């Protein structure tokens, strides 16, 4: 499944381990791709050499969009680049 690929800061997680989708790189990617976030939306989130799939939720407590991810499923992107070239 083709999911939009959006920048996220993996150090900007809330107390529940969800990534906050409010940093400048995220906002720029969303704007450039003309994406409006909604609950349940599936995204691929990346930061430098890491990426992970996540589902969007709105955090009422913080009034910010977040993405629920499985921290054990984070992938190193350069591994996939090397495999694709082989």
Feature-to-residue mapping (PLM):
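Short beta-strand-centered aromatic/proline hotspots
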Residues: 50-61
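Short, well-ordered loop/turn sites that connect or cap secondary structure elements
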Residues: 36-38
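Short, basic/aromatic beta-hairpin or loop at an interaction surface
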Residues: 6-25
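Glycine- and charge-enriched low-complexity intrinsically disordered segments
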Residues: 2-3, 61-86
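Short, charged beta-turn/beta-strand-edge "cap" motif at the junction between a beta-strand
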Residues: 42, 46-52
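Short alpha-helix capping/helix-loop boundary micro-motifs
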Residues: 23-33
């Amino acid at each position: 499944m083709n999911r939009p690929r959006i920048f996220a800061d993996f150090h900007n997680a809330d107390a529940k381990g969800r990534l906050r989708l409010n940093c400048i790189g995220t906002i720029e990617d969303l704007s450039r791709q003309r994406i409006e976030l909604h609950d349940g939306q599936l995204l691929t989130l990346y930061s430098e050499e890491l990426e992970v799939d996540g589902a969007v939720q709105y955090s009422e407590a913080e009034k910010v969009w977040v993405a629920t991810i499985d921290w054990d499923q984070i992938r190193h992107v350069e591994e996939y680049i090397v495999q694709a070239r082989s």
